[in-house]
Structure formats: structure tokens, C-alpha cells
Design a protein with these regions (language model features):
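Acidic, glycine-rich catalytic/binding loops that coordinate metals and/or anionic ligands
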Residues: 1, 84-86, 110-187
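Short glycine/threonine/proline-enriched tight-turn/helix- or strand-capping micro-motif at secondary-structure
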Residues: 2-38
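Serine endopeptidase catalytic core focused on the charge-relay Asp
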Residues: 13-19, 92-93, 113-119
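Short helix/strand-bridging catalytic loops that position acidic/His residues to coordinate divalent metals
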Residues: 22-25, 73-82, 102-104, 136-142
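Zn2+-dependent peptidoglycan hydrolase active-site motif and core
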Residues: 31-33, 39-82, 110, 114-116
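A structural signal for short beta-strand/turn segments enriched in small hydrophobics and glycine
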Residues: 42-44, 85-100
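Short glycine-rich beta-strand segments
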Residues: 63-65, 99, 120-122
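Extended amphipathic alpha-helical segments with heptad-repeat/coiled-coil character used for oligomerization
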Residues: 105-109
């Protein structure tokens, strides 16, 4: 399905860096009526409450500071973000973050409402410098928490192993994955 992680779109030519979870229930007007919960405890590092500012729509990013290296989870296309949450807020596991929705900087039909969920690593602490060198015509409104600066891992196998406590650090988990490519860099 196109909601899975990996090369699942456009006949395998487009990479989907997260997992799309569809609603279990809808209200009388057909809107998704599911709460979105945090997968792990963490701290809110980014909160975008303006749909048009991102293809992710309304979204937030948690840093899971008890993990080494820290991982990030991203919750996108939210209809709303729970009142009282702000950057720096600590979040418990299974805490309500918001409502599932269809927000984005483009149109997602109501019947395609979903949660776009990612788990991954942040590439750099100096993303803005990289962004400024590119020919983008829009402002980076998300600092180091732009989707371009987060690299996802497949959430399903990671979270399954995390729940079983089958690794002691995310690095141990990442090292257990098969090598996808090897590069030789010459200067």
C-alpha cells in the first residue's frame, strides 16, 4: 500500500519516509475522530500549528532524549494539536498529542485523512546553512526540524523491537539492519 514505509509509491520510484495510519472512527460529517498518541516519552522540539506552512500540515516532532543517539518521532496531518502542548513540553508515552486529520500545504481529501508517522534521526544541527545554499523560494519555517533534516527508519520493525527491548540503544538496532548501499567518496 502507498501508506507503508519505503519505495511504495509511483511504481517504486517515490520513497515514503513514514507510515500512514488511517482512522478507526469518523464523526457524523466524515472527519477522522481518532486521537493521536505519543509512541514513546519525549520532549516536544517542534510544533507547527499552521497547515499551509508545511506539506506535513499541522505537525509536531518529539525528541526521545532517553535514547542514545536520540531519536525523533513526527506526527503529521493533524486536524488539531492538543491544548497546552508547546515546544519544550515533556510528553509521556501514550499521551494525547492531537486529532488525526487531513491538513497540509496541499489538498488532502477528507476521506483520505490519516496520521503520517515517522521515527528517525536528525541529520544536522545547522540545517539552515544548508537550506540557504539551495534555490528554494520558500522560507524554512521549521528550523532543524524540517522534514529535509530528518531521516526516517521503518517505524514498524523498529517499534516492535523497541517494545520487546531487544536492543539497548538505537545505534545497536541500526547496526543490525542490512546494508542498503556502500559508497566510496573520493576527493
Amino acid at each position: 500500500s502507498s501508506g507503508a514505509f519505503g519505495c511504495v509509491r509511483n511504481n517504486g520510484f517515490k520513497f515514503h519516509e513514514g507510515l500512514d495510519l488511517y482512522p478507526v472512527k469518523r464523526d457524523g460529517r466524515g472527519r477522522a475522530d481518532d486521537n493521536v498518541f505519543s509512541a514513546m516519552e519525549g520532549v516536544i522540539r517542534h510544533l507547527n500549528a499552521t497547515s499551509g506552512y508545511s506539506a506535513y500540515g499541522k505537525y509536531l516532532v518529539l525528541e526521545h532524549t532517553t535514547l542514545n543517539p536520540p531519536l525523533y518521532s513526527l506526527y503529521a496531518h493533524l486536524a488539531s494539536i492538543e491544548d497546552g502542548l508547546k515546544v519544550g513540553s515533556s510528553v509521556r508515552v501514550a499521551q494525547v498529542l492531537g486529532k488525526m486529520g487531513n491538513t497540509a500545504s496541499y489538498r488532502i481529501p477528507l476521506d483520505r485523512s490519516h496520521l503520517h508517522f515517522e521515527i528517525g534521526l536528525r541529520l544536522t544541527d545547522d540545517f539552515q546553512r544548508w537550506y540557504d545554499k539551495k534555490p528554494y523560494t520558500t522560507k524554512n519555517r521549521h528550523g532543524n526540524f524540517s522534514g529535509f533534516n530528518l531521516v526516517g527508519i521503518d517505524p514498524l520493525p523498529f517499534y516492535s523491537e523497541y517494545q520487546k527491548k531487544s536492543f539497548s540503544t538505537p545505534l545497536e538496532y541500526l547496526r543490525s539492519l542490512p546494508v542498503a548501499a556502500k559508497l566510496r567518496v573520493r576527493s
